[in-house]
Structures are given as structure tokens and as C-alpha cells.
Amino acid sequence: MSLVTDSPSLPEAAADSPLLAQVQLARAAARCTATLPTAIKNAALEAMATALLEHQEAILAANQADLEQAAEQVKAGELSASAYARLKLDAQKLADAVAGVRQVLRLPDPVGQALLIRELDEGLVLERRTYPLGVLGVIFESRPDALVQIAALAVKTGNSVLLKGGSEGLCSCQALMAAIQAGLQQIPEFPQGSLQLLTSRAEVKALLQLEGLVDLIIPRGSSSFVRYIMENTRIPVLGHADGLCHLYVDRAADVDMAVRLTLDSKTQYPAACNAIETLLVHAEIAPRFLPLAVQALREKGVELRGDPRCRQLVPDLIPATEDDWSTEYADLILSIKVVGSLDEAIAHIERYGSRHTEAIVTEDAAAAQRFLDEVDAAGVFHNASTRFADGFRYGLGAEVGISTQKLPPRGPVGLEGLVTYRYQLRGRGHLVADYTGPQARPFQHRDRLNTTGLS
């Protein structure tokens, strides 16, 4: 589908932007995708999924090229081991990404949903309906499969997106985008320019200056990376700067369960932002729990750091410093602190947590409820691994990122987090003057049942 990309007015900073043509194309595409029928968007998603599988060999070969170059960067100290781990894309990860695309396909269309239908008066009907945000800029590090998740969510929500992956995953991102574009070309109704790949840091800098043309920036990566993005743009930013998660083992915890949850929350994928960095243990259960947990964690290769009370029980732990409590390791390193009460655990989380995901292990229902109610985080869990904090596991199909801000969206941002709403008012020549003054006509304000929008 060809598009008209004229823009009648531009922000002053955008006039000379090297990205201007690309962003104008994206905005034109967004106007089209905003009103695409669900059937067309779902056909585009299925075409994407099919093309990704058909291009698997080329995608994995490109990823292998990235991995070989990244291995040299790790040796030279230019890339962390955790970043290298996130970069790897094998057949199973690709299959999981494709499954995520198809799950998004099966989810209800979030666009055109009626959140409110209210008859203000006879013939004067107010509706609040969902609508795409417009043009997204998504910048991510290391994980090339994130590109697939983001593209799927953008297609389903009718948004355009400009994607920039880390330089260490350039070949992988190019191969993935080539496959996705090949799939979308099979759907003639789907506009060109809605999904675009950026490949340089200069383009990112230019993107961050396009206030008024780009509606939302979503960074995914290290805390320093996310902070850089937040500090260098006036475009709204959705994301989290840290993933500093805690698991608290209460005095009433099932010890075996607590050990299993500790292992899963830390070692299942230590580079993930929802892996725990600090283990808090109640003093009453510490003598029984810590020896078992330490043994199990060491068998998984975890480096352990403990506070003084912890080292009284396990003397050979590395002493934990003040910096450890505020460090996101994203690696097989875990700090352990013994606390005297639930209050102390909550206070520690309040001071050092990043409002991402926090969990308690306990059989005490009252303690669990206090933790769930009082801990301020996007996700608060009871007797469950912090690793469940994920859009796919929540049934959102995929996530574009995790937001730790107080205002919505919060937590894993899926389809609902990528739409806004607008008020639509239909009347029959109604005048405000008729509803003011001594003889003012009264409003009826009758709510109707919600209905779905585009089909």
C-alpha cells in the first residue's frame, strides 16, 4: 500500500533530522493501521510467524555471526557475559518468539474497544474508545528476539514502530526484520513503513529529538542505558531503569519450597530483569533454610554474598557491602540478608527495591497479605517465582517492556499498554446554551452496555 507522507507542520528540531523521511513514512502508515480491520492485522501476524520459520536458517546463521563477534568483545572486556547470554538466539528461542506472535494473533483486538458509552441526553451520546498511540520508538539491548515481540504488538495495536537493537545483535536484527517484512509483503492491505529498523547510534540520537513526531520511546536494557534515554529526550518514555528484585523467606515458609523458589528466581535466567538480586531471610528460619539454599545455589555456580548475621550461619560467604543491596547483577551473583521481622524485610525492599517484582515465601496467610498490600512494586507475588513477571506468562502474548512507574501502564506492557483512548461525542445539533441558565435542560447521563469496536 502506498502512502502520502506530507506533514503540514514540523517541530523546529525535526526539520533537518536525517530520520525525517522515515518518521513521516511511519506516521502515514500509522494513520492507516489505526483503522485496519482485525482480520487484516491477524493475517499480517500469521504471515510474520510463517516467514520467521521459513527464514530460520538465515536468522540463526546471522545470530551465530553476532555471537562470534560478541565472544571476542567479552574476551576484551567490552561486553558483559550477561549481555552475551541475552544475545543468543537458538531454534527454541525462535520457536518461542513465533509462538508469542501467534498468541498475540489470538488475543482480542485492543483497538476500537468501548470503555464507556453514556447518553448525556436524548440523541447526545458520548463514547470513550481505545485508539493506537501512533509512532513508537523502541530501543533495546542484546536480545534480538525482543524485536519479534515488539513487532507483533505494534501490528496488533495498529502502531508504527522504529526499532533499534544493540550493535552486538545487528546481523540478527537485520535477518529478523527481513523475514518479517517478507511476511508483511504478502498482505497487500498492510502499509509499508509501519515497521522500520534503525542501525546506528546517530539514528537513535536523531530519534530522541523528534518530539511531536514520535509519540512514545520505550527503552529496554541496562539501568545506565535506560537513564541515558530518559535524560536525553522530551518524548514520553515508558520503561524501567533497574530490575532489582527480592525474594523474602518468611519465618513460616515451607523450607523445601523456599529453596526451589530461590533457585528458580535466581538461576533459571539470571540475566533477566525479573531475576532476584537479594534474598531476605527471617532470622527464625535462617538456621534451617540457609545451609540448604547455599548448597543448592553453589551447585548452580552462584557467587554468594552475605551480611554479618548471614555469615554467622555460613561463615565462608563473601561479605556483602552497602553497594550490594542496590546492585542489579544480571549474573550468577546473589546477596543474602537475615532480617528480624516482616517489617524489616518490607523496609529493606522499600529502600533498595526498584519497584519491579518482589516475592514472599510463607504459609502465613496474614503475613502474605501484608506483603502483597504494603510492598510497592509492579508485581508482588506469594509463593511464586519472580520469573513469572513476563507478558507471555501473564497471557498478554508478548511484552514491549516492563514499566515500574506508578501511572499506567504498569508491569509487563502488552497490547493494552500500547493504546490510548479518545472521547467521541455524537449529537443532533445539541447546544451547550440549552443546558445553562435558569431554564437549563437537565442531563440524563444514562450509561449503556459496553460494546466492541472494529471487526
Curated annotation (Swiss-Prot):
MF-aspect GO terms: glutamate-5-semialdehyde dehydrogenase activity; NADP binding
Keyword Oxidoreductase assigned: yes
InterPro entries reported for this sequence: Ald_DH/histidinol_DH, Ald_DH_C, Ald_DH_N, Aldehyde_DH_dom, G-glutamylP_reductase_CS, Glu-5-SA_DH, GPR_dom
Pathway the protein takes part in: Amino-acid biosynthesis; L-proline biosynthesis; L-glutamate 5-semialdehyde from L-glutamate: step 2/2
Pfam families recorded: Aldedh
Entry-linked Gene3D superfamilies: Aldehyde Dehydrogenase, Chain A, domain 1 (3.40.605.10), Aldehyde Dehydrogenase, Chain A, domain 2 (3.40.309.10)
UniProt keyword Amino-acid biosynthesis, yes or no: yes
PROSITE patterns from the UniProt entry: PROA
GO terms of biological process kind: L-proline biosynthetic process
Keywords linked to the UniProt accession: Amino-acid biosynthesis, Cytoplasm, NADP, Oxidoreductase, Proline biosynthesis
Catalytic activity, as annotated: L-glutamate 5-semialdehyde + phosphate + NADP(+) = L-glutamyl 5-phosphate + NADPH + H(+)
Localization of this protein: Cytoplasm
A GO cellular component annotation in the UniProt record: cytoplasm
Enzyme nomenclature, EC number: 1.2.1.41
Functional note: Catalyzes the NADPH-dependent reduction of L-glutamate 5-phosphate into L-glutamate 5-semialdehyde and phosphate. The product spontaneously undergoes cyclization to form 1-pyrroline-5-carboxylate.
Family: Belongs to the gamma-glutamyl phosphate reductase family.
NCBIfam families reported for this sequence: PRK00197.1, proA
Protein name stated in the entry: Gamma-glutamyl phosphate reductase
UniProt lineage: Bacteria, Bacillati, Cyanobacteriota, Cyanophyceae, Synechococcales
